[in-house]
Amino acid sequence: MTVRRATIEDAKEIFAIEMDCFSVPWSLDSIETELMNQEKKLYYVIEDTEGVVGYAGAWLVYDEGQITNIAIRPSARRQGFGATLTRALIEECFKRGMHEIFLEVRISNLSALSLYRQLGFTVKGMRKNYYSEPKEDAYIMSLIKEERK
């Protein structure tokens, strides 16, 4: 299992993961745009022996990180890829001076909620009807650098 910074060459693999994981995936153009300008953005991929199995990204805004996506191929879930990838993203955000990291998660995504809580995230609020297809609320979660586990 290897975590590394994503490059533009990873765009098609990331797009394939988006298609596998999300009901409303980002377009290939959007992914390429994100990967081309990583000064205020961080994108990582995680690989196994067969290639990229997941990716995660965050936007860096002043002293806050906003996790945009964390996605692991369905066939690679429950093997530690998500935790390893998310920890790497968190560490880099804090290394770059972020004080707090935010994310949104479907209230029904119990696996992700469990992982985020294990990593020290806490629920700060809710966004009504944040997701579409299916329509669902999102929890807003955050991790403060000084309070992390």
Where does each model-flagged region fall?
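Short glycine/proline-centered loop/turn elements that form peptide/ligand docking sites
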Residues: T86, N109-A112, N129-P134
